Amino acid sequence: MSQSKKIFTRMCLNNWGGINHKVLQFNEYVNLFSGKSGSGKSTVMDAIQVILYGSFSPTFLNKAADDAKNRRSVLSYLRGEQKDGSANRGDCDFCSVIALEIEDTGSHTFTCIGIAFEVRKNDSEIKRFVYFSHSGRMPEPSYVTADGFCYSNNDIKKFVNTRSQSADRHARSEE
């Protein structure tokens, strides 16, 4: 009989780095991140760190991926800032969600944890964010409204509240 463990099954990146909307599938045993320089390996790893540790400190992010003129920060990831100085979301207000789906291999239950952000085009720091967790798998489509927009902080709170009314009542959001 194998021992129960918690494994990442999926990851959702909405408006993070150069990614508009992506759901990554993880293998239970081995996951290899490979690609050319600038392809997004560190972008994914930094998102995992931000979710798990909740730190927005630039010193916490992957320093090895920085070069002298491009210092990574959570705000620069949210804006989708590129090495050439452009930004995918630099001149608009937008929302972002990064989340991990975790399976308990013993009970085959799922829990999702993540952070939702709201960023205004003139923000110089992160002001509006919500840490959240809920039971069950990620919603479909992953934290995106029927209109195709990333969930806002209020959308996340409503979703988490709905999940907290479910049979297992395991959900939470905090600002």
What are these regions (language model features)?
Residues M1-C150, N154-K157, T162-Q165:
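Extreme N-terminal "head/tail" segments of very large remodeling/mechanoenzyme assemblies
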